[in-house]
Amino acid sequence: MAKIQFIKGIDEQTVPEIRLTRSRDGNTGTAIFSFINPTVFLLHSSSQNYGEITGMYLQDDEGELSTRNVTANFVNGKPKAVEAVYLIRNKSGWDRLMRFINKYAEDKNMSFYKS
């Protein structure tokens, strides 16, 4: 099962919008994951301490991909969204990310399409 976490051990329930860019030679690129009202904010508003957001972790049966490039957006002083940027450095990294995205979409009964 493919899952996304911001705090290790706690699955994010909000499904992100994922925007992909790719270099002309197809070897490098960027994946931007945007989460509106992610459930991780609900954890931080509770009285229990679940820990800090330390990155975004993409986990599936092949292992884990991660990025520390995670930012929170606030509206009127309240957390509203999280955006994470995952850099793809080579063709095998691109292929691996696409396998994760396809597994994640399948697990969530969604489909992937090119725009």
Swiss-Prot record:
Pfam families: Psb28 (PF03912). It is found in: Plastid, Chloroplast thylakoid membrane. Keywords: Chloroplast, Membrane, Photosynthesis, Photosystem II, Plastid, Thylakoid. GO terms for biological process: photosynthesis. It is a peripheral membrane protein. GO terms for cellular component: chloroplast thylakoid membrane; photosystem II. Gene3D superfamilies: Photosystem II Psb28. It comes from the Eukaryota. Transmembrane segments: none annotated. NCBIfam families: PS_II_psb28 (TIGR03047). Part of the photosystem II complex. Belongs to the Psb28 family. This is Photosystem II reaction center Psb28 protein. It comes from Cyanidium caldarium (Red alga). The lineage of its organism: Eukaryota, Rhodophyta, Bangiophyceae, Cyanidiales, Cyanidiaceae.
